[in-house]
Structures are given as C-alpha cells and as structure tokens.
C-alpha cells in the first residue's frame, strides 16, 4: 500500500493508454513522457504498459505502507526517501513507514513512480489511465491509498537496476524536435511555413496535459485557420487564427477544427513534454516519416537493451 500525503498540480495514474475509443470522442490519455514511463516499468520488470503514478509540475509526498521496490524516472525532480537522496532512473527499496518525497526542481515537468508488481486498480474502458475531464480512472487526492500488485517479480531484488544517463532522453531547455509535414501544410503561405520551421518557440504557461501552446513568430495562413473538424493525432501541431502553434499531447481531443501544419515524431515528444513553460524553447526539424519511425524504434531499443542489471534477482526482500 502507498498513501498520497501531498499531491502535485498534475498527479494521475497513467498506463499505456485507453485505446479503441477515439471514435467516441474519448482520448487515449497515457503518459506525457512515454519514454520515462516505459523505462520505469522496465526497470522494475513490469509490463511496458502497466500503470505508474505520474507526478507533474509541482512536488509530491508519499507514505510507504508496504515493503516494496520502486523507481522514479523523468526530469525536473529531486527524490528523497526519509530525507536521504535517491538516484532517479535507479531502483531502490522502500520499507513500511518510509516517506518518499519528489521535490520539484528546474529541468523538467514530469516524473513517473513505478512499483515492482504494479498497482492494483480497476480498469475503465480497458485502461486505468486518469482522464480528468470525463472522470475516467482514479482521482489521486491527499489521503488516497493505492494497493500494490502481486506479480512474481515483486519478490526478487531489483535494487540497483538502472538506465545509464547516455541512454536517457537528452532533456533540456532548448529542444530541437523532429516533425513531419502536416495534413494542411498547403494552407500556409511560404512565409508562414518558413516561420514555423525556423522559429524557436517558447512554451506558454497555459499548457497542460491536453496540449502545449507555443509562442513566437506568427505563422501566416493563406485562407484562414478554420477547417471542417478532422481527427487529430498525438503530436499533431495545430495553428489557430492567432498564428501560434499548439502541440497535441496525451489528453488531446480526438478532433480539431484548426489547420495542422506538422506532426511531431513520437521519438521527440518526451523532449517537448519536459520542456518547462515560460523557460524552455522548441524548434522543429523537418524529417520524413521513415526517419521518424526509425528514431522511435531506436528510442525503444535504448530501454530494451540499455538497462544495467548488475543485481541478484533472487535475493528476497
């Protein structure tokens, strides 16, 4: 059991996502930083899409009520257990009565807390992911207690398993994100396209799990921003009438009525997600679909083959 003592501004349960319901207007949700989420599960030997606690934008505190092994991945947090510093991206052991603190620091927005054995939560529409606007999934509030799962790996020592720094995403305040040509690129003037591909945009503080609003040089349309609403994809970049791009993220709506100038490669979405509002800047680099697919596969391989496993898996807690 783990109890929430202090919630962050954005705290939720996120698994691999709620798939199969977008045609009904239900977003997939899932983690803002898919790499950190997947790596957290891999480090504690859970399944890739198992549920983690996503902590976002501010600090959080937890009371550990059951002996367990945990890992915290992501960026922008300093982790302590009973006041003792713990290394992110490295598995450590907690005992009943411990207090785990995730202190918000510069350098990122989102952290993922994964427990060996997973979290025992009911699914809603095939997923445990929280989607606040529709009331789907568990609302994580102060005093909420989460029961841990009982998968076999939870009994084996995983302490020390880690993903080396060189295998982690290169988070930072200056991001160059790969992107492909969008559905409506012909709806923009040459000057507008040039602005998009050559401007370093800042992150508007009015950003959230649905989308990051960017600020910078205005992107000029040929015939207006509005279109008949069409499906939107994770990473698609819409440009409304004000000419400021909006990057669709985990809780993005299933349809949108603004022109889509580009789609960000899934490989680089974690870099954007961890880019701090009001501080970070994002510039887009045009790539082909094939290049984007290759880059994503390479990121997955970093998790699958990059974990240091210099521990005795058969040492019991």
Question: Predicted segment positions?
Answer:
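Conserved "landmark" site that anchors the functional core of diverse proteins
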Residues: 1-317
């Amino acid at each position: 059991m783990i109890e929430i003592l202090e919630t962050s501004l954005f705290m939720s349960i996120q698994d691999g996502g709620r798939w199969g319901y977008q045609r009904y207007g239900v977003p997939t949700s899932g983690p803002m930083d898919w790499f950190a989420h997947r790596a957290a599960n891999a480090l504690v030997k859970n399944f890739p899409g198992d549920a983690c606690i996503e902590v976002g934008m501010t600090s959080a505190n937890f009371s550990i009520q059951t002996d367990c092994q945990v890992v915290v991945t992501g960026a922008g947090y300093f982790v302590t257990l009973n006041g003792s510093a713990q290394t992110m991206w490295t598995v450590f052991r907690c005992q009943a009565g411990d207090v785990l603190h995730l202190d918000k620091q510069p350098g990122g927005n989102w952290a993922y807390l994964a427990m060996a054995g997973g979290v025992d939560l009911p699914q809603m529409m095939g997923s445990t992911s929280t989607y606040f606007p529709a009331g789907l999934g568990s609302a994580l509030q102060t005093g909420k207690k989460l029961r841990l799962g009982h998968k076999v790996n939870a009994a084996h020592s995983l302490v020390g398993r880690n993903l080396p720094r060189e295998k982690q995403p290169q988070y930072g305040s200056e991001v160059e994100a790969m992107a492909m040509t969008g559905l409506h690129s012909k709806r923009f003037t040459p000057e507008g396209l040039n602005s998009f591909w050559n401007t370093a945009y800042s992150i508007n503080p009015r950003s959230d799990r649905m989308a990051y609003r960017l600020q910078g040089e205005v992107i000029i349309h040929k015939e207006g921003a509005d279109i008949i609403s069409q499906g939107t994809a994770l990473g698609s970049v819409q440009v409304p009438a004000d000419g400021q791009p909006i990057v669709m993220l985990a809780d993005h709506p299933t349809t949108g009525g603004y022109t889509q100038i580009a789609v960000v490669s899934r490989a680089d979405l974690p870099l954007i997600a961890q880019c701090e509002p009001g501080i970070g800047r994002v510039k887009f680099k045009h790539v082909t679909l094939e290049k984007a697919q290759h880059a994503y596969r390479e990121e997955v391989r970093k998790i699958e083959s990059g974990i240091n496993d210099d521990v005795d898996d058969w040492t019991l807690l």
